[in-house]
Amino acid sequence: MVPYFEMAAASNFSFLCGASHPQELVERAHALDLSGIGIADRNTLAGVVRAHAQWKDIRKESGFRLFIGCRLSFIDGTPDMVVYPRDRAAYGQLCRLLTEGKHRAAIKGECHLEWADLLFRARQFQIAVFPPDEDEPDFAARLTEIAQAAPGSVWLALTMPHQGQDGRRAERIARFAAQAGVPLIATNDVLYHHPDRRPLQDVLTATRHHTTVFAAGRLLEKNAERHLKPPHEMVRLFRDYPEAIAATADFVAPITFQLDELKYAYPDEPIPPGKTAQQHLYDLVWEGAARHYGADIIPPKVQGLINKELALIARLEYEPYFLTVYDIVTHAREKGILCQGRGSAANSVVCFCLGITGVNPTQVDLLFERFISAERKEPPDIDVDFEHERREEVMQYVYDRYSRDRAAIVATVISYRSRSAIRDVGKALGLSEDVTAALANTVWGLSGGGIDRQHIRQAGLDPDNPIIQRAVELAITLIGFPRHLSQHVGGFVLARDRLDETVPIGPAAMDKRSFIEWDKDDIDEVGLMKVDVLSLGMLTCIRKAFDLIHQHKPQLYGGEKLTLASLPREDKAVYDMLCKGDSLGVFQVESRAQMNMLPRLRPQEFYDLVIEVAIVRPGPIQGDMVHPYLRRRSGQEPCTLPSPSPQHGPANELQQILGKTKGVPLFQEQAMRIAMEAAKFTPEEANQLRRAMATFRKMGTIHTMEKKMIDGMVNRGYDRTFAENCFNQIKGFGEYGFPESHAASFAHLVYISAWLKCHHPEVFAAALLNSQPMVFYAPAQIVRDAREHGVTVLPVDVNFSQWDNILEETPDVHLALRLGFRQIDGFSKRDTELLIADRQEPYRTIEDMHRRLRLDRRAFTLLADADAFGSLDIDRRAALWAVRRLPNDETLPLFRAAAASELAQEPRTKLPEMAASEHVIADYETTRLSLKGHPLQYLREGLAAEGVSTCRAVQEGADGRRMKVAGVVTVRQRPGSAKGVVFLTIEDETGIANIVIWPKIMKVFRREVMSARLIHIEGRIQRSLEGVVHLVAAKLQDRSAALIEMSGREAQRLIAPSQMAHHPRNVRVMPNSRDFH
């Protein structure tokens, strides 16, 4: 068979152009018996690692080859060309070429290249030039110039596109080649691995050009021929140019480069004179251990762990990596930035002693092999969380320390998800925005299995309409396709030498940031080490809470400012609060599922919080571990574990692993320990099991470990049924298994945030509000919860408020929470600073403020809308009237005093007072909360007439009782572990109610569940023994119209039409719910 190499294959990393994944191209090329394939995406190397990973398995079986290249597209008229580096040095030059082009482009994601960029590098590449589709007068001269720049390395690409004049076109291209003295090379210029992807490629093309498939015309391919073809088909197509087929082998002959050749070198860290990196790390670790435990009382267990870890770190030469993370953490702490490590790094006593993590090895059993293992040859990965508002300072420190040539953020591939796929496909197929939106709104969360016909019908669409059917089919295929590259949340790659000779680097959308083209899985594949500089809102909240306590209660805690390490531990009052499920705003345990679990688990000590964090996860739930654990914890079920045969090990070997979790494996480390102890896996095999647990839903790889583990346990005397059950529990972890060390890191913050809520609720509420946006709860729910805990909350006021929410002393010596200007939607921090700067004397009137301040009328209107003039003894309506009398912003300075004087002469108009309901509505419109009431109380009379109860009545209702309730939807959740069950949290003037919606009810009332803001529910009370109350829904109604009607009616009376049009919240009564899929 004639060898044929396809050297111009574009994957879907030629964004919105290629219609196949890199893996699909490699797999298909091998299946078609091609000799090899070259992946050449347009101005990027973003997809090559995925192709390489797929090829690694294939090459073990055959001589099939993969080539790493790029299709260069120029902005100066130079024709497109695919280039392949011959060796490692040439690959580095290709990376630098793309990096230069990316930084030259003004628009993120583009790459502006000119022929001069390639000219001095051309001799290092194999180059195939693509002729223009139509005659260009200067093409022959340009081709000759390219050929002279890289003699013997340039080919002219020849395709047979089946467009009616292939023969004539081929003759023209052959003449160009002859004139320039370059050979022809055959290619199919591939855009997809299989012809059935052509319709999707049309959609991608239409999307790229912001048009529809029907209007795209010549922008689309004329047929479905640009797919991978087998060698015999290519030989037939090029029968008049057999030399072009043979040239593919000549083209690849000098190419030796593979990604395997990338040898990563971590940067050396500065160390004290006369010391090695190993000695410096050794000193820092033992100094840290002495600080934690006392120099003479370091526990023997800890000493042994330190020696073990330091020996392995030295063996693998990872000392510089640990020193880097130590340096970053130290810098953050010197700047007063809270930080804490988490993830598998919390398995390391070295990380604990260095102050990187907060998990004390005397509290939790650490499994260092989960973090670093000599056998698996993977670099360590340390995740450190920093305050989200100050994380950028740390990131810029990293850039400054290592330079932008040697440091960059890892990429994140932004891929199509269900809704975005439907939207883009719908637009491309010419569906109206209304139809596309309706179709997209039928989808909740990720989905690759299509859209239920009934859901399409409920959206008011015809599921039998062929365009609708086509849109759904194409969208399903598009899910998972890369849309564009973005920056990772904080993963840095650092290099000893130029990083841009290993991977291209481009500018990020954020100023002063740059990121590489590979994501975290790609860098794992090629062995690059990553330092994660992550952000965590709760750390910001905790730091602000510590500051407020130190500012307002300096007499407490010995006058010292609290730290993560110094806060009082094991406080009974904190655990009592959590046992009640009173955890709104508390880190990691504020979700509905966690609030319901807390009264059942009843945490009494720190390790209970570790379990609490981990147990409400899809892994333990799907592995059927939750109920057995709770039954054993409450004494309803004995905890008995089998033993191996006497000759194979101690009788309590499983008890040592599972004792703390009542015989139930809840953590990844436990799964690995069971495999190593009960089935005698090596550490490498145990890590393979962990990896299989993490990927089996995508790859199905965990089954390859099943026989080995079960047989290993049976051979050591365990019952086969027990071994199978044990393995099935582990398999249930899926990709959701939680490392114990990670849970322990998060449990630390659970306790600290719960302690703040328990002992300083006003401080905690202020810190939460000042750290928004956070995750679960909106400001209205945070304020409601604070008031339920006895906190006095005061409104925004021009004479008392700051930008942040602050604490004020009250006559009864309690601290009240004063809302800040940040709560007013649309009011800027700059205007706040101007207002406060001129507040040495209190503001007396709005006219007084206007004379003293250079705020525009819009700012005054926002203040009036928010009822922020309370201390001036003027209500919202009068304030709005007064603001309308202020001079226009365009008034010239010369006339400003005259205008103000004229304004002052007009007597104040007596306006009718606003109704309480009007005030509440306006509050929600401007500050997203109200201290005066809740919109539902003004609908209560009508609701009561319908027999609708309050949320408080639901909480007090008897088990099994049928009730009706209505409330504003604040949270929607459909956890992946809940098997289609949807949970709603609704709110009225009396509190909240928790709603459970079973899948069969969800199917009937899907639209109401997904879109209602005010919802009416009929159902039956379900009350657990621990007092957790749900209303199990049987029927739902969308009553949002009542809110909208109230909003429109009251807003018309409150705000002039011209103001309504520019209102920052578009006159919404309630903020949107927070939805979690």
Swiss-Prot record:
Its EC number is 2.7.7.7. It is an enzyme of class 2 (transferase). GO terms for cellular component: cytoplasm. It comes from the Bacteria. Keywords: Cytoplasm, DNA damage, DNA repair, DNA replication, DNA-directed DNA polymerase, Nucleotidyltransferase, Transferase. It is found in: Cytoplasm. DNA polymerase involved in damage-induced mutagenesis and translesion synthesis (TLS). It is not the major replicative DNA polymerase. This is Error-prone DNA polymerase. It comes from Brucella suis biovar 1 (strain 1330). The gene is dnaE2.
